[in-house]
Amino acid sequence: MEKKQISSLELLKLTTDKGDTSYGADQKWFFGPVKQRSGCGPATAAIIFYYIDRKKEPEKPPMAFRFFRIFLERMWGIVTPTRHGIPEARMLATRIKNYASLRHYHVDVKSMEIPENPSERPHISEVFRMLFEAMDNDVPAAFLNLENTSCPDLDTWHWVTVIGIDCDNAGFARVTFLDNGSVKYFDLAHWWTQGKGAGGIVTVIPKNDRRFW
């Protein structure tokens, strides 16, 4: 059995203007219905970068809700979806690199596409390795689910933020992720073998100490 996760979920705890607790961002926090419908990619990127910064000064209070919404808008300005969202891992990775470059921040950004056709996919061990690498570096990862409906908590055509993965020898691989302010789970092995398992992964590993926001 192998279990890896980020060191502190509490660093991603935010309080909304209504006093509700949220873990990570909710894409409904964007301004305007278009952004709220298609903001999962930039919201996921914002969560990853926010966590990296929070780790540097964990004793400080979390970002105020109104400022986090501004942070999301800034992220949208660079990690901008197309009219079809951000349906490929390489697209999100490119936008993240652009954001980091504009902020003069050096990061190692990796992406992996997971095609629907089994013959075109990477081996599932490569998927585990990529997620484990992110967790080993104590950074959340971005996971894209396209048309797979086999996992009830995982929306289709949607980016989520992976914060942990727990594998056993029986083939179970529980992924812990954040989506719209909640902690959720899905079985990666089940996702891989059932339905249309197309999607992708993006990881972001920082290489210096510059703040993101």
Question: What does each of the following model-derived ranges do?
Answer:
Residues 4, 125-129, 134-136, 145-213:
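Active-site signature of cysteine proteases
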Residues 82-167:
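Predominantly the structural core of cysteine protease catalytic domains
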Residues 59, 63-64, 111, 115, ...:
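A sequence-level detector of short, solvent-exposed, charge-rich linear segments
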Residues 1-98, 102:
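Active-site-adjacent structural segments surrounding the nucleophilic cysteine of cysteine proteases
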Residues 64-65, 69, 73, 121, ...:
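Short alpha-helical interface elements
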